[in-house]
Amino acid sequence: MLYLLTAFSDGGDIFNLFRYLTFRAGAAFFTALIFGFLFGRPLIDFLRRKQGKGQPIRDDGPTTHFAKAGTPTMGGLLILSALVVSTLLWARLDNPYVWIVLLVTVAFGLIGFADDYAKVKKQNTKGVPGRVRFLIGLLIAALAAIAAAWSHPPDLTLQLAMPFFKDALINLGWFFVPFAMVVIVGAANAVNLTDGLDGLAIMPVMIAGTTLGVIAYVVGNFNLTDYLGVHFVPGTGELLIFSSALVGGGLGFLWYNAPPAAVFMGDTGSLALGGALGAIAVCTKHEIVLAIVGGLFVTEALSVIIQVLYFKRTGRRVFLMAPIHHHFEKKGWAEPQIVIRFWIISLILALIGLSTLKLR
């Protein structure tokens, strides 16, 4: 929105700064961060008053989690509000990719909010039926995939870009739409499954968001794509604003979510942030790289799938408990130990993902 002030610039005043993507990205980061610091405590106090007993704790989970009873959930509202406000202030609102990612984020956030509300109201861990959440998510992802395909250049519309190869594209035809749907819905649910320990999900989300923001900037810059041999998608650089706001809002939330957490992000935050990562990957044509950068989320989701399928077939479990972070809890790992080690893994995977821009 503030980009419009460049119309009043004579080239030598402060308004001219708004032309620069990197300046607006930095401003978006600090806007979201300050928003989180300012409104975090009032929101937590409000949620605690409204929710009473807070988020229900699973009876079959690790016994250490019982001490978390009474902690309010829906803290994702803080991240979402900071993210949306900052993006609307600093991004170019005539950019279709900004709106695609922003609307996907808000839509998945609403699904998560409904689920969190149902859990708190009923005081159980069921919430909205999984099938309902899944179908609504598929609908949102389908609309986003079609909008992204419509916005992409004609030579990229239905293509899948392959990392590690210069200008390597595979024509998926209209299979691109269901593929993109799987990416967005899969990312949303994978982050949701990862959000089981204080601070566990938000840092890997910020690391992945930073990585995808850099990728969006590169992919949207013709000179950089020409040098690196990466496909050029005009306009995606503006997603750096969104990613910067995501990281700023995430840090503001982590201030209150650090162990012992004063608030949980809930499905409101995890579904929204996962959907956002998936949408950015689809818009930038880096869906496969997302699987690398978000490898921690993929592992968490696969651990649940493997556990369920193996148990149905044999009546036995592969892991002591799924998702896999609970397996390590059952093995006696301390919660901070699991969280920090998973953060380190996420950082390593992000560096590998970034290397795909050069290793071609």
From Swiss-Prot:
Pfam families: Glycos_transf_4 (PF00953), MraY_sig1 (PF10555). Its EC number is 2.7.8.13. NCBIfam families: mraY (TIGR00445). One of its GO terms (biological process) is cell division. Signal peptide: none annotated. GO terms for molecular function: metal ion binding; phospho-N-acetylmuramoyl-pentapeptide-transferase activity; UDP-N-acetylmuramoyl-L-alanyl-D-glutamyl-meso-2,6-diaminopimelyl-D-alanyl-D-alanine:undecaprenyl-phosphate transferase activity. This is Phospho-N-acetylmuramoyl-pentapeptide-transferase. Keywords: Cell cycle, Cell division, Cell inner membrane, Cell membrane, Cell shape, Cell wall biogenesis/degradation, Magnesium, Membrane, Metal-binding, Peptidoglycan synthesis, Transferase, Transmembrane, Transmembrane helix. It is found in: Cell inner membrane. It catalyses: UDP-N-acetyl-alpha-D-muramoyl-L-alanyl-gamma-D-glutamyl-meso-2,6-diaminopimeloyl-D-alanyl-D-alanine + di-trans,octa-cis-undecaprenyl phosphate = di-trans,octa-cis-undecaprenyl diphospho-N-acetyl-alpha-D-muramoyl-L-alanyl-D-glutamyl-meso-2,6-diaminopimeloyl-D-alanyl-D-alanine + UMP. GO terms for cellular component: plasma membrane. Pathway: Cell wall biogenesis; peptidoglycan biosynthesis. Catalyzes the initial step of the lipid cycle reactions in the biosynthesis of the cell wall peptidoglycan: transfers peptidoglycan precursor phospho-MurNAc-pentapeptide from UDP-MurNAc-pentapeptide onto the lipid carrier undecaprenyl phosphate, yielding undecaprenyl-pyrophosphoryl-MurNAc-pentapeptide, known as lipid I. Its cofactor is Mg(2+). Belongs to the glycosyltransferase 4 family. MraY subfamily. InterPro entries: Glycosyl_transferase_4 (IPR000715), PNAcMuramoyl-5peptid_Trfase (IPR003524), PNAcMuramoyl-5peptid_Trfase_CS (IPR018480). It is a multi-pass membrane protein. The chain crosses the membrane at residues 27-47, 71-91, 93-113, 134-154, 168-188, 199-219, 239-259, 262-282, 288-308, 337-357.
